[in-house]
């Protein structure tokens, strides 16, 4: 794994150029796993701020050969010491072609400068061996005489079980650079049946012969703007071990990228997520320039929503959430045009929803249940995901979401809080129809005044209390709520009982206004109630 510096941009006004942090390119080797074929092969990843690129090794001609010539024909002169100077693996019995697995430095194969580890052997002295077994190719090479002509083509997607070395690109390579393969190497550096005893001239490149070089070539570039990451096998709740997949907005996928350790996977997950978040933030800033102050996007991004099947089975599906203006939106795909904002699967008023952190991992073996808002009914969150939150909406509707990182959970928590507080202050008050003992009443929650109840017909105020006077509440979970207020003069508790068509929306609204009021008076207190952010800061 490495990071390569790229050219730095001009320094922003007010910042010295020597303090400018250059853009960085992150690279690493990984396995690209084909879940259908259950096969994997080596790739190199290249991560920039905007793109994740998949690279595969290939042998390219750097001069002396017609463009597009993929096959190379090389004549080897067998040497008394070292033979052909190479080893091979594979064969038809393993479902792969015979490939060169080792090239020994300064011996016959190395001296040609035209053969590479990973080359598939296609012909030996004009005999096609593409479907030959390992032993058949070994026998043919050992008995091919002093001069052996082989035709090869680089195998770009060599199965990982071949354990071919991936050292510095070039003809020579340290044959001990990787773990051994279950397929043995047949060493052809030993002498075959030579007809002479005098030392043979080495296999040297001819001046006008084509020159080749092994390089990492870009094969797929996945744009990260509005992209999402998944660590789970599609359609299941099976967590891939040390693996992830990146899916672009247009549906393009990196495929399953398998890392050597869980730590490497976590490192790349964080790096890719950070770049996606940065690009999303840029998109939000551009969109907000065209929106009114009351219609700004506060936060948006991908999550996974838990869906309940008819047979009580549970599975998660990707959803795109957005907090904009007065609403919380749920989309099947990111909104990229003005019209898309009217095509949300769900839209809720921010004052009437309740955000709850449910759980996040403290370590590999322990998780913390975090009921962020005490005093309200707990919500069952039985799911296998690591970082979960729920959004409780009107009429008891609920949505459970998961994210890939604890940092994302903290960001969503803060974003919901900020968006809700902004909407409360913009709205100022909300009024709901209610009834008691057959009378139609109006109940108002006001950011400045607190609670007011007045007659729906005469508009006469029946009672009014400040937020600080609310000392408790209880409800039947359906339509009826009891609010307990303390009279400022008598210090006695007064009970006010009301009925609402959508009790959940009213309770959430009360909570939103009280939380916004507390935050306006003591912002530090609200931050102290954030379980997710508190854990992330301590860890």
Curated annotation (Swiss-Prot):
PROSITE patterns: PDZ (PS50106), PH_DOMAIN (PS50003). Keywords: Actin-binding, Cell membrane, Cytoplasm, Cytoskeleton, Membrane. GO terms for cellular component: cytoplasm; cytoskeleton; nucleoplasm; sarcolemma. Residues 73-156 form the PDZ domain. It is found in: Cell membrane, Sarcolemma; Cytoplasm, Cytoskeleton. It is a peripheral membrane protein. It comes from the Eukaryota. Residues 296-421 form the PH domain. Gene3D superfamilies: 2.30.42.10, Pleckstrin-homology domain (PH domain)/Phosphotyrosine-binding domain (PTB) (2.30.29.30). GO terms for molecular function: actin binding; neuroligin family protein binding; PDZ domain binding; structural molecule activity. InterPro entries: PDZ (IPR001478), PDZ_sf (IPR036034), PH-like_dom_sf (IPR011993), PH_domain (IPR001849), Syntrophin (IPR015482), Syntrophin_4th (IPR055108). It holds the Pfam family PDZ. The association with dystrophin or related proteins probably leaves the PDZ domain available to recruit proteins to the membrane. Adapter protein that binds to and probably organizes the subcellular localization of a variety of proteins. May link various receptors to the actin cytoskeleton and the dystrophin glycoprotein complex. PANTHER family: GAMMA-2-SYNTROPHIN (PTHR10554:SF3), SYNTROPHIN (PTHR10554). Interacts with the dystrophin protein DMD and related proteins DTNA and DTNB. Belongs to the syntrophin family. This is Gamma-2-syntrophin. The gene is Sntg2.
């Amino acid at each position: 794994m490495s990071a390569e510096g790229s050219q730095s941009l001009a320094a922003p006004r007010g910042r010295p150029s020597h303090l400018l942090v250059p853009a960085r390119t992150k690279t690493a080797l990984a396995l690209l796993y084909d879940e259908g074929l259950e096969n994997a092969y080596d790739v190199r990843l290249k991560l920039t701020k905007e793109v994740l690129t998949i690279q595969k090794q290939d042998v390219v001609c750097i001069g002396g050969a017609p463009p597009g010539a993929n096959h190379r024909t090389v004549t080897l002169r067998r040497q008394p010491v070292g033979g052909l100077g190479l080893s091979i693996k594979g064969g038809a019995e393993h479902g792969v072609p015979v490939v060169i697995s080792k090239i020994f430095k300064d011996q016959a194969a190395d001296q040609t400068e035209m053969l590479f580890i990973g080359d598939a052997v296609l012909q030996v002295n004009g005999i096609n061996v593409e479907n030959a077994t390992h032993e058949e190719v070994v026998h043919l090479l050992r008995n091919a005489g002093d001069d052996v002509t082989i035709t090869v083509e680089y195998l770009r997607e060599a199965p990982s079980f071949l354990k071919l070395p991936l050292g510095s690109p070039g003809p020579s390579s340290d044959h001990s650079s990787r773990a051994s393969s279950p397929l043995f190497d047949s060493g052809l550096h030993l002498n075959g049946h030579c007809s002479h005893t005098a030392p043979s001239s080495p296999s040297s490149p001819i001046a006008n012969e084509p020159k080749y070089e092994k390089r990492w070539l870009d094969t797929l570039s996945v744009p990260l703007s509005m992209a999402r990451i998944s660590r789970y096998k599609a359609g299941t709740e099976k967590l891939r071990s040390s693996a992830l997949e990146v899916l672009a907005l247009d549906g393009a996928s990196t495929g399953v990228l398998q890392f050597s350790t869980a730590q490497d996977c976590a490192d790349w997950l964080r790096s890719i997520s950070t770049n996606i978040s940065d690009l999303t933030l840029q998109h939000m800033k551009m969109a907000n320039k065209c929106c009114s102050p009351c219609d700004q996007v506060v936060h948006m991004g991908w999550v996974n929503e838990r869906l309940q099947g008819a047979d009580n089975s549970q599975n998660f599906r990707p959803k795109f959430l957005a907090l904009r203006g007065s609403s919380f939106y749920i989309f099947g795909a990111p909104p990229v045009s003005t019209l898309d904002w009217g095509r949300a699967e769900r839209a809720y008023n921010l004052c009437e929803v309740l955000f709850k952190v449910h759980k996040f991992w403290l370590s590999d073996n322990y998780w913390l249940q975090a009921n962020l808002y005490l005093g309200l009914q707990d919500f069952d969150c039985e799911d296998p995901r690591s970082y979960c939150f729920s959004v409780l909406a009107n009429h008891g509707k609920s949505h459970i979401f998961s994210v890939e990182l604890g940092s994302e959970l903290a960001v969503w928590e803060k974003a919901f809080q900020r968006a809700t507080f902004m909407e409360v202050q913009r709205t100022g008050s909300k009024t709901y129809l209610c009834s008691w003992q057959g009378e139609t009443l109006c109940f108002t929650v006001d950011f400045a005044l607190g609670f007011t109840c007045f007659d729906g017909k005469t508009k006469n105020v029946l009672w009014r209390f400040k937020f600080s006077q609310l000392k408790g509440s209880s409800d039947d979970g359906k339509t009826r709520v009891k609010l307990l207020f303390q009279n400022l003069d008598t210090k006695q508790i007064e009970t006010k009982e009301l009925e609402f068509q959508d009790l959940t929306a009213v309770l959430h609204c009360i909570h939103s206004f009280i939380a916004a009021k507390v935050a306006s008076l003591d912002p530090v207190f609200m931050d102290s109630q954030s379980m997710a952010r508190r854990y992330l800061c301590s860890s």
